[in-house]
């Protein structure tokens, strides 16, 4: 439901800006209201509020029957799936038993309840009541999963080990669902990546701004005794404070190395090296770095309906970086919404800069200082990524991924002859063959890239910016052939989702702070890059085109 809720969120924004009254051609016939279609999508995501097989929440029994609202957890689960026969003679549909903090979207739930155009698009009986309950339940989940440090822990499940087994003794629960450090995926764990934090909490910060600035509906959150705005503030204050303490503008003056288990099931420890912030930071005005990966320890308390400090639930930073520009931008987006909701104005930037440069820890800052520092940090992240990584295409970082050796080393393993087909014949692995849609042959032992030959890029469409004259694939293969790994392979990508998050963060800054200068000195740090350098322009006979800059000729 992540993408669906984002779409609903986008339509809600459009409606708030007064530009959402649009229609699109629809397969359901004629021009359809975008808001009505978003409401219809809300109807459909109600299935994400159910257990995979609609079994009762907390049943812990694989033989338990499903099929009633007892199987409704009101959270956004990991997926919905459906299918059936081509002739329509039968069909199936499932929900999911696992709920990740990353996939919750209280802003979308709030929009479906409170935006009249979106709400009118929902036709299912009880849809409004379901999303009212879902909004409250999602907020309770975030309160339950907030660590002692600030970041949000993994999630919960109604199906232990995917088999509805009994929960382990002492396992923390949330409305009879068991805590999971890494819901859905364990290899690698699903809640290491910092993107889970910044994407999820951006929605909370935007919702906080909406409720605070629009004199909007501010309902109670379950039995917590907190209004929605109060619950959001409790989460955001600690979360923002943690990022304020652990984001680097400049470069740390030293490093520290330690060992820890990356996954809960690891038998050996991994060595990590990260910046040592205790040795201070030297700000060169250009560099920046944010936490990139976390490991988790402990678990939350059992949820009893009211917020409790989770003193036994902690996280540790095991990676830093500046190359994940989508995450950097989403963090900036979050900080900007938080600052605006707290009442920080553009005119406060001088004080915000001073406050940030003189800060010690977030816990020592007043509410006003933390909000001002938030705006300053958000703006600095946007300015620095723009100045450091902008090129003639967009924003791109020279990246590195040692796992790319798996392109050639990971082999397809087909059945070894122990499986029978429908004709009751035992087939050897050599008999299991087929063809991919692109024509690649599927057979036992072929490499990952052999059935994805489009990666080989024989057309030269994807040239390497890091090794002139070679395609990205040929350059990677050359590095692999030379050393048996891709440790020396670097590549520059302009990822679509990075570009999307960058544009949305810049848009948020313009929406909330339209008078904010691009850089502190009011002058862009780079001239516009135009490629190619010679451009032919055709104008009508009645028009005269004249350059307005010296040195320009036509």
Predicted features by range, described:
Residues 1-34:
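Post-signal peptide N-terminal segment of secreted/secretory-pathway proteins
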């Amino acid at each position: 439901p992540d993408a669906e809720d984002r779409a609903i969120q986008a339509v809600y924004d459009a409606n708030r800006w007064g530009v959402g009254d649009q229609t699109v051609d629809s397969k359901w016939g004629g021009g359809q209201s975008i808001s009505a279609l978003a409401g219809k999508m809300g109807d459909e995501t109600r299935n994400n509020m159910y257990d995979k097989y609609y079994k009762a929440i907390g049943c812990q029994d694989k033989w338990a029957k499903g099929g009633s609202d007892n199987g409704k957890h009101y959270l956004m689960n990991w997926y919905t799936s459906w299918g059936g026969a081509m002739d329509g003679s039968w069909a199936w549909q499932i929900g999911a038993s696992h709920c990740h903090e990353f996939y919750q979207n209280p802003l979308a739930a709030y929009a479906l309840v409170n935006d009249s155009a979106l709400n009118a698009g929902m036709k299912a009986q009880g849809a409004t009541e379901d999303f009212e309950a879902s909004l409250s339940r999602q907020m309770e989940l975030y309160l339950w999963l907030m660590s002692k440090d600030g970041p949000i822990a993994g999630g919960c499940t109604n199906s232990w080990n995917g088999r509805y087994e009994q929960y382990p003794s002492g396992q923390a629960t949330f409305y009879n669902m068991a805590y999971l450090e890494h819901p859905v995926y364990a290899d690698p764990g699903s809640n290491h990546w910092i993107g889970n934090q910044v994407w999820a909490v951006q929605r909370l910060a935007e919702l906080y701004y909406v409720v605070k600035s629009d004199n909007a509906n501010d309902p109670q959150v379950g039995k917590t005794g907190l209004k929605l705005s109060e619950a959001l503030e409790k989460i955001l204050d600690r979360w923002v404070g943690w990022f304020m303490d652990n984001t680097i503008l400049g470069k740390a003056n030293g490093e520290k190395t330690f060992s820890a288990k990356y996954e809960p099931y690891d038998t050996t420890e991994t060595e990590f090296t990260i910046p040592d912030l205790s040795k201070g930071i030297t700000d060169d005005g250009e560099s920046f770095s944010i936490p990139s990966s976390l490991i988790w320890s402990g678990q939350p308390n059992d949820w009893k309906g009211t917020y409790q400090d989770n003193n036994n639930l902690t996280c540790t930073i095991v990676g830093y970086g500046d190359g994940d520009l989508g995450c950097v931008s989403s963090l900036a987006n979050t900080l900007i919404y938080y600052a605006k909701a707290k009442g920080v104005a553009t005119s406060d930037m001088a004080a915000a800069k001073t406050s940030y440069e003189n800060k010690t820890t977030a816990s020592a800052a007043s509410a006003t200082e933390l909000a001002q520092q938030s705006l300053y940090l958000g703006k600095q992240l946007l300015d620095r990524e723009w100045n450091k990584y902008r090129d003639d295409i967009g924003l791109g970082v020279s990246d590195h991924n040692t796992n790319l050796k798996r392109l050639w080393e990971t082999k397809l393993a087909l059945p070894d002859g122990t499986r029978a087909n429908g004709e009751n014949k035992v087939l050897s692995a050599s008999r299991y063959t087929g063809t991919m849609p692109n024509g690649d042959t599927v057979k036992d032992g072929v490499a990952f890239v052999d059935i994805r030959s489009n990666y080989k890029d024989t057309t030269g469409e994807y040239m390497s910016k890091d090794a002139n004259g070679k395609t990205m694939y040929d350059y990677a293969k050359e590095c692999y052939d030379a050393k048996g790994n891709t440790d020396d392979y670097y590549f520059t990508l302009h990822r679509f989702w990075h570009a999307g998050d960058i544009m949305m963060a810049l848009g948020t800054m313009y929406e909330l702070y339209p008078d904010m200068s691009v850089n502190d000195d009011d002058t862009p740090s780079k001239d516009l890059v135009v490629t190619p350098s010679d451009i032919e322009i055709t104008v009508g006979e009645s028009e005269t085109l004249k350059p307005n800059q010296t040195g320009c000729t036509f």
